[in-house]
Amino acid sequence: MAKRKEENFSSPKNAKRPRQEELEDFDKDGDEDECKGTTLTAAEVGIIESIHLKNFMCHSMLGPFKFGSNVNFVVGNNGSGKSAVLTALIVGLGGRAVATNRGSSLKGFVKDGQNSADISITLRNRGDDAFKASVYGNSILIQQHISIDGSRSYKLKSATGSVVSTRKEELIAILDHFNIQVDNPVSVLTQEMSKQFLQSKNEGDKYKFFMKATQLEQMKEDYSYIMETKERTKEQIHQGEERLTELKRQCVEKEERFQSIAGLSTMKTNLESLKHEMAWAVVNEIEKQLNAIRDNIKIGEDRAARLDRKMEEQQVRLNEAEQKYKDIQDKLEKISEETNARAPECMALKADVVAKKRAYNEAEVLYNRSLNEYKALKKDDEQLCKRIEELKKSTDQSLEPERLERQKKISWLKERVKAFQNQENSVNQEIEQFQQAIEKDKEEHGKIKREELDVKHALSYNQRQLKELKDSKTDRLKRFGPNVPALLEAIDDAYRQGHFTYKPVGPLGACIHLRDPELALAIESCLKGLLQAYCCHNHADERVLQALMKRFYLPGTSRPPIIVSEFRNEIYDVRHRAAYHPDFPTVLTALEIDNAVVANSLIDMRGIETVLLIKNNSVARAVMQSQKPPKNCREAFTADGDQVFAGRYYSSENTRPKFLSRDVDSEISDLENEVENKTAQILNLQQHLSALEKDIKHNEELLKRCQLHYKELKMKIRKNISEIRELENIEEHQSVDIATLEDEAQENKSKMKMVEEHMEQQKENMEHLKSLKIEAENKYDAIKFKINQLSELADPLKDELNLADSEVDNQKRGKRHYEEKQKEHLDTLNKKKRELDMKEKELEEKMSQARQICPERIEVEKSASILDKEINRLRQKIQAEHASHGDREEIMRQYQEARETYLDLDSKVRTLKKFIKLLGEIMEHRFKTYQQFRRCLTLRCKLYFDNLLSQRAYCGKMNFDHKNETLSISVQPGEGNKAAFNDMRALSGGERSFSTVCFILSLWSIAESPFRCLDEFDVYMDMVNRRIAMDLILKMADSQRFRQFILLTPQSMSSLPSSKLIRILRMSDPERGQTTLPFRPVTQEEDDDQR
């Protein structure tokens, strides 16, 4: 909507159409005095005289018809065209389609089947306030043509029918002049807009309704527009001031040019002097360049020397690393050789132990046999002696019955000996079985004991890992060692105290992040000890860091490695030497590294740009061991940590990542399961050991029983054999001489002596074999213990060997790094030296040229570029002076024009500044007036609303909150204080419609539009409320004859009082096929006659 004229925002005293309202009892406060005016008797401008519609909405032709100057009732049933008249009024006077609540686009108002619609509205244009009375005459005809595509065009015609304008701006000017507001709901209030307003719960919407109805909102927008204009003016002032600076500079230049006409010869002299200075200034600059190049060469040579020293130091460190690797390897080889050397001895000693045990057992058996034989001979001796005594005493021979009895007993004894011998063989077999079982159990016991020791070592390692992982949950740095957080804190303190040139970076594993967590083990297997390493800028920083590490790492324990390399802020460009494969990343690309020092150190020490990461083992073999491995790729690592070369494959000893895993909880859970499994495994092994020990003890007991039983059987056999012999001896010829028996006894004694001597020898041999057996067992246990010790020593040495191998690789890469840097530096240095030679030749040429221009060397303070600019500027001045020499009038004119332009703009800027200041004062005054005017309208609206409600004995409240922009309305339909105030939505349909009419009439009383339109104002009222509302409207219309009222209703209006000011426009129901609606005006008298 176009901006209103400034007069629209004046106070009520300066309103365009002053009038006086009949306030009756309202004039109780002093504020109403500001709102009084004069009364007009008839409307002269802005009211609607006639409307004519064609193909509009669902009507082919509607009208033409004329409205009265005061009260007009448009009556008719639904579908008769009442709403079409109101909609056409809004659209025809430039309103938007959405404001009608009948459609969202203008093309929706064109009747179906037609290409366009036409609206013609005639406005009254009489009296002193007429709009361009000489052009339009007493009326203005507004014709609007709406096309099917939604576009519209205007024709503004005079009273004679001639077209005055087709521009919408002219229509807006007319509406502004007549103060017609088609989008103001007080001027034109449709039934839908009224319903939306009454049902709104937002008090802010009601406040906006009030502001829009009273044009206060337009005034507020105009104030905002003025303030925006003020800010734009300030910006113009700022731009003008900048332009003033430029104009002043141009004016000064023109003045200098004007004054320089007389100094032409001086300028030529100055030009020659500047040329002399320029010649030697060029020499000075070349000399400075030469000095800078010499300085750079000297710095470069110093750096080359430093690089040589670093290469030597790197070579020393490489030699030390290789020596350390060789020493560890030698130790491992020595341990391996010693272990291998002791293996045959161990086997031999084991076999010797078995042989010694067997020999001892055999000797023990022989001894026992000799002992039994001795005992048998001793018994035989006793029996012979007894027999001799019996023979000596016997005087008579045995009888035959005795002999038969002896024969029978001999047979029984022989059968018994045979049974005992069978038992002896069976028990001997059991003894051998028990001895084998005991030997087997002892071997198994030793094997399980060693396995238990290995599992305990693994359990201890896992428990340490589990503790470190749990500590790392609260502090990730503890993954790299329990002392790392304290070491880093010490590094920070030392750096703050200035002990480091640059703060060391590390551990490197804490400075990198994985893009793919599945590659954690692969990257750890690749970087190994580098994950715990630290980077230092120089060897001085390294020495400080070594001193700090001594505080946290005990002597003899391994410390994190330290990499010494000059810190750089940019990562090396390794694109020319990096490995590439379309499907697999390198270690460098698989890592997120924010610190360039970390990336460069890993590139130098491990060559991570040349190492591929291939998750699948078989795919890694296929890629690396093919005929054409990837370019620049030295090796690859799999997700299991295996290392793959072109011709070799090494499996990883580790099964899980230690430093780079992100899922710490999962690792803790896995380790806890492993600890639990190993604890259970140790328990099972211990139970197995206990079971074996029980079996060994049980078998040894059974063996002892068998051996005891075996001895008992031997004794029984010997006893029975002795009895048999004794009985058989009795059977011999009884005539045997006693001397013979005595000879036999003597012979038996000799045998006993021999057996006893042999037994003593066997006993000594058995004791000797027993000592040999114990000695062999001790030797076997000692060498077994030594072999186990060697195995335990080899495990940490293997870890140290891996670290040493990584260190050797790192030092080799460091050496290559310094060699490459030295080569690049020497190339740059040689280039500088060639540049020096060229500059020296150039200096000789420039000095020769300078002597030709100025033989004697002069001191020059300005640079050649400044002198060159001054020479060019002076030449231009001289050329300009030559071109304008003698035309002093032209130079004078240019100077005067520049000066006048500057002064004119300066005057305008000063004027605008005064205007801004004055505008601020005016706006402050007008805003106060605006607030006073708003207060006046608010009070009048409250008074009118309360007075109108009192016609029905209602009470009402209107609470305005201008700060929060809210308006709350409450109505009490009862008498006095008997009923509570209610929101309008809580009222009945008739009460709400009546209250709505009162509110609208209150706004009508303070609004300035020349006409008011109200659609179906009484549709929800009962007869009593309709009568009262009608009386209120007619009373207001009678008091405001200078305004036009158009009221749309479906009621017949037969009860209206007789008045020439009232015109009823009755619309008939359209008949089937009818294209033109009869629309005729009826006066009150005609309506009464028809009834």
UniProtKB/Swiss-Prot annotation:
InterPro entries, alphabetically? P-loop_NTPase, Rad50/SbcC_AAA
Residues that coordinate or bind ATP: 76-83
Could you say what the effect of mutating residue 292 to V is? In a breast cancer sample; somatic mutation
Q: Which residues are in coiled coils?
A: 226-451, 660-914
Q: Pinpoint the Glycyl lysine isopeptide (Lys-Gly) (interchain with G-Cter in SUMO2) cross-link.
A: 268, 773
Keyword annotations for this protein, in alphabetical order, are: ATP-binding, Chromosome, Coiled coil, DNA damage, DNA recombination, DNA repair, Isopeptide bond, Nucleotide-binding, Nucleus, Phosphoprotein, Telomere, Ubl conjugation
Organism, by scientific name, is: Homo sapiens (Human)
**One annotated Gene Ontology cellular component of this protein:** interchromatin granule
Similarity comment text for this entry = Belongs to the SMC family. SMC6 subfamily.
User: Which parts of this chain are annotated as the region Flexible hinge?
Assistant: 452-659
* Protein name in the entry: Structural maintenance of chromosomes protein 6
Main site of residence? nucleus
Map out region (Disordered) in residue numbers. 1-34, 806-828, 1072-1091
Please state where this protein is localized: Nucleus; Nucleus speckle; Chromosome; Nucleus, PML body
